[in-house]
Curated annotation (Swiss-Prot):
It is found in: Secreted. Pfam families: Toxin_34. Its main location: secreted. Belongs to the neurotoxin 04 (omega-agtx) family. 03 (type II/III omega-agtx) subfamily. It comes from the Eukaryota. One of its GO terms (molecular function) is calcium channel regulator activity. Disulfide bonds are present. Keywords: Calcium channel impairing toxin, Disulfide bond, Ion channel impairing toxin, Neurotoxin, Secreted, Toxin, Voltage-gated calcium channel impairing toxin. Expressed by the venom gland. This is U2-ctenitoxin-Co1a. GO terms for cellular component: extracellular region. It comes from Ctenus ornatus.
Length: 39
């Protein structure tokens, strides 16, 4: 799975983390109509 940037969309699955550009890990958070990524 490719790295994603802070704020990019993710699939909304809390346990499906992706790496960030700085080699940190992302977690998903939920907006009313979309999911986002925080690292």
């Amino acid at each position: 799975r490719g790295c994603i940037e802070l704020g990019e969309d993710c699939d909304g699955s809390k346990d499906d983390c992706q790496c960030c550009r700085d080699n940190g890990f992302c977690s998903c958070y939920t907006f009313p109509y979309k999911w986002g990524c925080i690292c």
